């Protein structure tokens, strides 16, 4: 595969359905992880769509529903059906249609399969598709995907308690303006809500320690054991 990013303008395609996005992501993933079984049969493709691990959300699609999604992707030239087997087998054509290098395809596939993620999460979760040297290289390809015409990914605003922005793909449609990261926002700033979340967690842990100490004293009393040594440090 060509690994040189292609930032040229590409024809727009309609927004994919959630299941179409899942089918496309599964085909790209399995090409790398189970090459001996690729292209995939309808049964294998359905199992990949309904996989419990590495998927968000988890689905329970039928073969008929997956086949409908495949037909939709075939009309967009994103999926092709092989003709060399008695059992229909399907393969993706995403890289060529969208003009993606292998690095960008790995990131987009991981977003299709697992939903919004930070650059660090994407580096970890896409490792079997492409090994990124560091988070900076992940961010560089994300920025290029976001700069494509049309854009393929977008950076999301941080939610309360998050320290890093997450990214999401746009193949299934746009996201609302309230979800987008604001230009000029300080990347290293920690929102006040994050500190409040830490305070709440500290209080929860303190309450839990107090509860456990009470349980220890009660059990010690029932067993006739002096619990003084066990709780001596509770006021430290």
From Swiss-Prot:
InterPro entries: DUF480, WH-like_DNA-bd_sf, WH_DNA-bd_sf. Transmembrane segments: none annotated. It holds the Pfam family DUF480. Belongs to the UPF0502 family. This is UPF0502 protein Bxeno_B1639. The lineage of its organism: Bacteria, Pseudomonadati, Pseudomonadota, Betaproteobacteria, Burkholderiales.
């Amino acid at each position: 595969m060509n690994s040189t990013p292609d930032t040229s303008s590409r024809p727009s395609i309609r927004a994919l359905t959630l299941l179409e996005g899942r089918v496309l992501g599964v085909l790209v993933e399995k090409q790398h992880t189970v090459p001996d079984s690729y292209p995939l049969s309808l049964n294998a493709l359905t199992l990949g769509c309904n996989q419990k691990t590495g998927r968000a959300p988890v689905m329970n699609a039928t073969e008929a529903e997956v086949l409908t999604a495949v037909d939709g992707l075939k009309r967009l030239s994103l999926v092709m059906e092989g003709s060399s087997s008695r059992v229909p087998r399907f393969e993706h054509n995403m890289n060529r249609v969208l003009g993606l290098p292998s690095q960008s395809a790995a990131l987009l596939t991981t977003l299709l399969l697992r939903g919004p993620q930070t650059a660090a999460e994407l580096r970890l979760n896409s490792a079997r598709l492409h090994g990124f040297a560091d988070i900076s290289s992940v961010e560089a390809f994300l920025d290029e995907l976001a700069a494509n015409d049309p854009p393929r990914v977008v950076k999301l605003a941080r939610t309360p308690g998050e320290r890093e922005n997450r990214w999401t793909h746009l193949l299934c449609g746009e996201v609302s303006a309230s979800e987008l990261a604001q230009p000029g926002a300080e990347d290293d700033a920690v929102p006040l809500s994050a500190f409040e979340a830490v305070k709440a967690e500290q209080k929860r842990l303190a309450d839990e320690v107090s509860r456990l100490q009470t349980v220890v004293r009660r059990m010690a009393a029932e067993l006739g054991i002096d619990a003084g040594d066990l709780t001596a440090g509770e006021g430290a």
